[in-house]
Amino acid sequence: MQLSATSGRTSFRVSQDLRTGPANFLSGLRDDDSLLRQVFFSILRHHHPNLAAKVDVIYALSQAWCTSQSDNDFELMVKYVSDLKPEERILVASSFSHMLNLHNLTEEVNSSQIGRAVRLGEMDSPTRDTNHSLLKLTTTNGFTPQQVYDTLCSQTVELVLTAHPTQALRASLLKKYAIVRRELDTLHSKRMSEYEKIETLEAIRAAVQAAWRTDEIRRSKPTPQDEMRSGLSYFSTVIFDVVPVFHRRVDTALEKLGLPRLPLDRALFKFGSWMGGDRDGNPNVTAETTRDVVVLARLEAVNVYFRQVEGLMFDLSIWRCSPEMKELAERLAAAESRDAARVAEERKRRNYVDFWAPIPPTEPFRVVLAHMRDRLYNTRQVLHQCLIHTHMSVRGALEEAGAYVDIEDMARPLKLMYDSLMSTGDESVANARLLDLLRQIRTFGLCMMGLDVRQESTRHTEVMDAVTTYLGLGSYASWDEPKRLAFLLGELQGKRPLMPPGMDMSPEVKEVVRTLRILSELPGDSLGAYIISMAKTASDVLAVVLLQRETGVRPALRVVPLFETLDDLHNAPGTMTTLLGNDWYRGHINGVQECMIGYSDSGKDAGRLAAAWALYETQEKLVEVAAGCGVRLVLFHGRGGTVGRGGGPTHMAIRSQPSGTINGHLRVTVQGEIIEQQFGEKEVCFRTLDLYTSAVLEAALDPPPAPAQEWRDLMSLLATESCDMYRSVVYRTPEFYDYFMQSTAASELGRLNIGSRPSSRKSGGIETLRAIPWIFAWTQQRLHLPVWLGIGEALEAAIDKGYGPVLQDMYANWPFFTSTLDLVEMVLAKADSRLSAFYERTLVDSSLAPLGQRLRELLAKTQQNILIVVRKSVLLEGNTPSQMSTPNLDEKIRLRSPYVAPLNVLQALSLQGLRKFRDGGDTEYNPSDPEIIDLLSRDPHKKGEGAQHPFVSAMDDCLMITIKGIAAGMQNTG
């Protein structure tokens, strides 16, 4: 049977077998890809019939080349694309970008279908989940159910959302694509009438058409407040609702083992944020910015709790209750009855859904909930005032108004209601929406996500130097480490104030101090950790402890050193030995120390393999140092989304950590496009929570065995060899920087407006470039150099020395090594030497061509040696543990490739055109068609006096669209 949905001049069909069972998910993926491409082409033909024909030809040419890999087929595609007019290039780029994003939706739906089939028992799970972990630990590993229960109840995963500029898609498009994803999933998962199917297809068409008519390019840079609002949208639409659903699933799994539910006061997850708190290298994050985002997050929390409480007022109409509940309700009702008319009028003015009049004590739950609703409303009003009047102390204003400041003020009456319902035998009512709200309160608090503050270590040194210089004590910046430590510890153990009022300050020093003073005026639960980036010494930590005391930050934020470069990672154990060896400091931290390890800068500094091994060894040594000092260490993993910045499948990434470094508590960043990939939809969010929970549980009870000494020794040799090779190319090859800047879009990425932070810390070479644009640029150019450079030579050297069998044994039996090579293999499968060579041919000075040829030879060598170690004939052959989290990965990459290749060609041509024009080249391009002029005039910042030449506008837009499209094709940016 086939169904036809017709709109305007076109029609498209969907085969019934798209919605059959899970017998062939790969076939379903191809069918979904074909369906959405068909829908898109029907829209394109409706609006641009001539252009649609050209897009169709380019897609066919790209498919032919991706299949044959022949130079002739490639040149045919290049020739056809090169002949496009500038305005056609924009629309063709946009077409392929949209088709890639639509294809990605089919992959997400495919994953959801597989997950659903697993839960129905129709197929084995390709990844671990909490239910499987509970069964495995109790049946296979020999742990008692009580041991597993106690471990689960004590573990916490904290996911810290960051605003790193790696989400290339606009929120406007994400919302439309979410509709397509939902409706496509509906086609698969529901029994539908013929009319319902047609209507669902029309809904898909409407969303795709709206997306096509939406400008893909973000025309102005987002502010940190914009980034926070974007992050909060995931909570209000997805995460807040999924958390209690996931806890219910865990409760059910526990009950199947004869265990009780999770305790009411336990939260398996906490959420944090860097949005508006990360000021490292971002001048747009000011003290006022930090204040704003805290207020915005609290407003979001109050709004969602308000809706939940109002819903409970309809649910809990019950009259029977415990004596304690009755006493509270009568007391609140009596207070209201003294001014009943005013209460009713005020509630009516507030436009509540219902329950305006004072509620009688015979409905005790509603009495208490009405009081909570009033207080939430008041809290919201105060927070609105704080946004308007920026001079107000947020904490002071909330306390003065009697608004909610402490989450326990909300939790206590709700817990009383729960206990009351349980005592009267109304367990089912207690364990419905009320239990969900209790779980949400324990997870999100009143802050939704606690804000970390991050600042670079030298900024604190500047403040301390200003203080000591003003006091006539000398220059703190020139002191050696022992003198700094002696001074800081002396001040911390004394009681005198250090910073005199009216002290002269530079603007930079003033901003650091102003930030700390703002923190002192914010509710303590809204703040998380104070992260010190580029931390190198114990004094870096103590300086922040002292500055918090001097500025009145109470309670003080825990101070977390971030070790990022290879040298800093190697020196971290010594730094922490000095710090934790101090009696005063150990007492100050109450026996718990958090350290952050950075995956991004270490990889950029030393290469992927050397960084991975340094991170592994550093974690082991930090745990050992902390244990020796009687301190519990919490490791905060600063992972990025890409493999080059520590990204990878969640479960395998956690299970490959050194034994004893997780211990039931994981704190990890969720960056950029990964937020959408992990929390963009409820089914996906549920799976994300499931993976983290099961992985941390298994890491605590069933950690991987320690690697054999022979493996460690060989790994150290590999790390040294790969680091030397990586640095010799990146930092010691004089022409490398020029090749990088010419062959990639690195210098143009800053105009993409995907984040508030600049792409470089300061002007200079590779050293000053941030890790994100460094990875982003090579990803776009398809060489993916930061991920693999140095690894092929290191493996080859080891194989030549006879270590091939040892490497194969390491790969088969050591999760860390398995995960590392599998992720590199996955990236190698996305690399494309032919396209990279086209960038070089089009953009790079011929004198640099030998370097490009050498890099491509190194890529081929890496692919060859990886295949030897993993015992495969082609990349991604079979299902390895790391790749099992993405079933059919090789086929998915093949399906994406014909969409990506034209975008790479268009990007190289756009860069060529822009650079020639800016170097003084001339063009006769001067369109007169009003529709084309309108297309080239979408940027409001480039009109009037700021108007660009139409050719530059066309190439600029084409470039920006290709950057976004290729990011979608690679499924990551930086």
UniProtKB/Swiss-Prot annotation:
Reaction it catalyzes: oxaloacetate + phosphate = phosphoenolpyruvate + hydrogencarbonate
Top-tier EC class:
lyase
Task: Give a GO biological-process term.
Answer: tricarboxylic acid cycle
Main subcellular location of this protein, as a coarse class? cytoplasm
A single GO cellular-component term on record: cytoplasm
Which Gene Ontology MF annotations are present? phosphoenolpyruvate carboxylase activity
Alphabetized, the UniProt keywords read:
Allosteric enzyme, Carbon dioxide fixation, Cytoplasm, Lyase, Magnesium, Pyruvate
Query: Matching HAMAP family, A to Z?
Result: PEPcase_type1
Subunit field text: Exists as a homotetramer or heterooligomer.
Q: What is this protein called?
A: Phosphoenolpyruvate carboxylase 1
The top of its lineage is: Eukaryota, Viridiplantae, Chlorophyta, core chlorophytes, Chlorophyceae
Gene name per UniProt? Ppc1
